[in-house]
Swiss-Prot record:
Highest taxon of source: Bacteria
Tagged with keyword Lyase: no
Key words, A-Z: Amino-acid biosynthesis, Hydrolase, Magnesium, Metal-binding, Methionine biosynthesis
Native source organism of the sequence: Stenotrophomonas maltophilia (strain R551-3)
Cofactor note text: Binds 1 Mg(2+) ion per subunit.
Gene that encodes it: mtnC
General function of this protein: Bifunctional enzyme that catalyzes the enolization of 2,3-diketo-5-methylthiopentyl-1-phosphate (DK-MTP-1-P) into the intermediate 2-hydroxy-3-keto-5-methylthiopentenyl-1-phosphate (HK-MTPenyl-1-P), which is then dephosphorylated to form the acireductone 1,2-dihydroxy-3-keto-5-methylthiopentene (DHK-MTPene).
Descriptive protein name: Enolase-phosphatase E1
Length: 231
């Protein structure tokens, strides 16, 4: 069935895993203590700091919260509060021109082609929605955010949970079988397939030197880049 909507992951799918791990994560980790000290009383920041403090045992100093968050970065923990605070820190970095977001070279032309043909694009990433908008807005291919019709993060649910995709289907208001989900993570594709979505495994050699074929792909159609996605 021809998809009517594209839903895409970011890290490892549109963009290199190494950019996130080697540029964005270290930038946020280094900036966290000063950012918390400077902005900790702002309501949006306070909300997330308090959420972390509650999780680690109640009232505690912001410096301890910052250390905890740095530890979560080291563990690559997908925590909503961490993602939100990282997004606020990355906002400053993008706007100062400290970096631009990496996109694989074929992605922007393909996304523009889909947009021109009237195929809506949605993003679902473990990064917060504000961070996603920055990623697309300050990309090395220019501002790609106008190509995106909607954004989803882990506030709608975990990416390896079928119910998350069911909620996305309800939000988009298109039958699940007419939505194509793109990701580099087989377990995410499994969850999307369970919810009725079409799937493609993005298996980039830069990120996965050993091709994931056969059982490793778990029945998902495999492509190595966006140009190979046949619609």
């Amino acid at each position: 069935m021809q998809p009517r909507v594209i839903l895409t992951d970011i890290e490892g799918t549109t963009s290199s895993i190494s950019f996130v791990k080697n540029v964005l994560f270290p930038y946020a980790r280094k900036a966290l203590p000063a950012f918390v000290a400077e902005h900790g009383q702002q309501p949006e920041v306070r909300r997330w700091l308090d959420a972390v403090a509650t999780e680690i045992g109640g009232a505690c100093q912001d410096s301890l919260v910052a250390e905890t968050l740095q530890g979560w970065i080291d563990q690559d923990r997908k925590h909503t509060a961490l993602k939100a605070l990282q997004g606020l820190i990355w906002d400053e970095g993008y706007r100062r021109g400290d970096y631009t977001a990496h996109f694989y070279p074929e992605v922007a032309p393909v996304l523009k082609g889909w947009h021109a043909s009237g195929l809506p694009l949605y993003v679902y990433s473990s990064g917060s929605v504000p961070a996603q908008k920055l990623f697309f807005g300050f990309s090395d291919a220019g501002d790609l955010s106008p190509l995106v019709s909607g954004w989803f993060d882990t506030e709608i649910g975990g990416k390896r949970e079928a119910d998350s995709y069911r909620r996305i289907v309800q939000a988009i208001d298109v039958p699940a079988g007419e939505i194509l989900f793109l990701s580099d993570v087989v377990e995410e594709l499994d969850a999307a397939r369970e919810a009725g979505l079409q799937t493609r495994l993005i298996d980039r050699l830069d990120d996965y030197p050993l091709p994931r074929t056969g059982q490793a792909a778990n029945g998902h159609e495999r492509v190595e880049n966006f140009q190979q996605i046949q619609l």
